[in-house]
Structures are given as structure tokens and as C-alpha cells.
Regions:
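Alpha-helical scaffolding segments of alpha/beta enzyme cores, especially the outer helices
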Residues: 1-7, 29-37, 58-69, 90-97, ...
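Short helix-capping segments at alpha-helix termini
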Residues: 7-13, 37-38, 70-72, 97-101, ...
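Residue-level recognition of alpha-helix initiation/capping sites
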Residues: 25, 57, 133-134, 198
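Catalytic alpha/beta core domains of metabolic enzymes, predominantly
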Residues: 65-68, 80-188, 192-195
């Protein structure tokens, strides 16, 4: 996948490659592979084992080991701490101190108050670490807190709208930002409906409707979403001004 992406982009855009593994040694292998394959940065996912609890030293060691094998910038994926995989702010700050190649976090903490606290803590450091929002279900609200960008799965469908929204917020053009948000809202409502696990399946169906994918394929145990839901996605794309009625 990385090789295909690299060949298609031909250096026009940076490539962020995800690193997800339950063990740090496997994470190191993936990081090396991504580095050698031409990635520009690495997005480090938290292991699922953290749902059973984590020590700060465990979380930091996992990231430190990845940084041992590559000098690529690291983006730490911050999950919701309530689920166990997210890092307490104190752990996150220690991690940033001890791993100097951390350049940003992808913030999915799921809490506006915590998101605000993280932005202030990370932006205010002598070596600022950027906060990239992935609160795609409430993107407008998250960006106005002071995020330095966004890293969102729904960018596969609405990257242009997301970029316009970010620029409007950066320019403090509230009226324009609200206007763009009104379009983004329709897609967020269908992409991030229950069950949440189907969000990427829905985005694939949207890309088919937009003529950007020939078909939407899912891997078991995921299943194709029903026709009625695909129709709701079609109506949302129309409401967002992305598809003709």
C-alpha cells in the first residue's frame, strides 16, 4: 500500500504511514519498513492491550522503541482515555519530553475540555507539539480550540471541505466557517452514526456514489451496509453539495 501511494503521489505530497502493533518489536519492524518505503512521517497507534490498563513507562517505552529505528517525525494517536488506550496528559507530556522526534498528536480524546487542555499544554512548550484534530463528528468545534491542523478519515471524501474549514477558522472568518460547517455536518451525521465501527464502510460507499471508487469492499466480520443506509449517504452528499440530486 505504501509503495502504491508513493508511486501515485510521485513526491507531490507527504505520506503519513500508520504503525499499529500489539508488541513494540513488531512496531519497530513496521516503522523500519515504512521508513525504507518512503514515508514522510509515522502515525503511532496505541496497542489494544492498553484497554486492560497501562503504566506511563509502558506507553513511553513503546514510542521510544519506534524512535530508535527511525528519525521520521512521529504523530501520536491520542485515543479517548476512558477506553484505556488514551494517554493521561501527564503521560503524554512525559512522552514528548523523552522522545524528541514527536512532532504532533492526532487528537481523538473525545472530550472538549481535555482537548482544550492538551492544546494549551502542547502549544505552550519550548518545543511546541502540534495538535491535529480527528474529532471529525464535531470538527468545527474542535478546530476553534486552536488545533494546528487535522488528520481525519473522512478526508478521503471531503478533504477539500475540511481544508476550507480549517483555513476559515485560521483566518477568523466565523461566518464562512459556519457556512462550510453546515455542509460538513451532513456527511458527519451519516458517517459517524451508530454502529460507529461502520464509519469507513460508509465512506467507501460515499466514494462509490461520487464515482471515485468502482465498488465498496469490506473484510469480514464487517458486512456491507444496507441499501437504505446507502440511500441516506446519497442524500447527505446531495445536502452537502457534493452530488447532484
Amino acid at each position: 500500500m505504501l509503495a502504491i501511494t508513493r508511486d501515485e503521489l510521485a513526491g507531490r505530497l507527504p505520506i503519513v504511514n500508520g504503525v499499529y502493533a500489539e508488541g513494540s518489536l513488531e512496531a519497530q519492524r513496521l516503522a523500519r519498513m515504512a521508513h525504507e518505503g518512503g514515508a514522510s512521517a509515522l502515525l503511532v497507534f496505541p496497542p489494544a492491550i492498553y484497554t486492560m490498563g497501562q503504566r506511563p513507562e509502558m506507553a513511553i517505552e513503546h514510542v521510544r522503541r519506534i524512535a530508535e529505528v527511525t528519525d521520521l517525525p512521529l504523530i501520536i494517536f491520542q485515543y479517548n482515555p476512558a477506553g484505556g488506550q488514551g494517554y493521561p496528559l501527564s503521560t503524554l507530556l512525559r512522552m514528548v519530553d523523552e522522545v524528541p522526534t514527536i512532532a504532533a498528536i492526532k487528537d481523538w480524546c473525545g472530550n472538549a475540555q481535555l482537548a482544550d487542555r492538551q492544546i494549551r499544554a502542547l502549544n505552550g512548550r519550548s518545543r511546541p507539539v502540534h495538535v491535529l484534530s480527528t474529532h471529525s463528528a464535531w470538527l468545527f468545534s474542535s478546530l476553534v480550540l486552536g488545533c494546528k491542523g487535522l488528520l481525519s478519515g473522512s478526508g478521503s471524501v471531503i478533504a477539500d471541505l475540511q481544508a476550507q474549514l480549517f483555513e476559515a477558522v485560521q483566518n477568523k472568518d466565523l461566518a464562512l466557517a459556519q457556512k462550510i460547517h453546515d455542509r460538513v455536518y451532513h456527511t458527519a451525521e451519516v458517517f459517524y452514526a451508530d454502529p460507529f465501527v461502520d464509519m469507513h464502510n460508509r465512506m467507501k460507499e460515499a466514494l462509490v456514489l461520487l464515482g471515485k471508487l468502482p465498488r465498496a469492499v469490506v473484510r469480514p466480520p464487517l458486512v456491507k451496509i444496507p441499501a437504505a443506509e446507502i440511500e441516506r449517504i446519497r442524500q447527505a452528499l446531495i445536502a452537502a453539495g457534493l452530488l447532484a440530486a
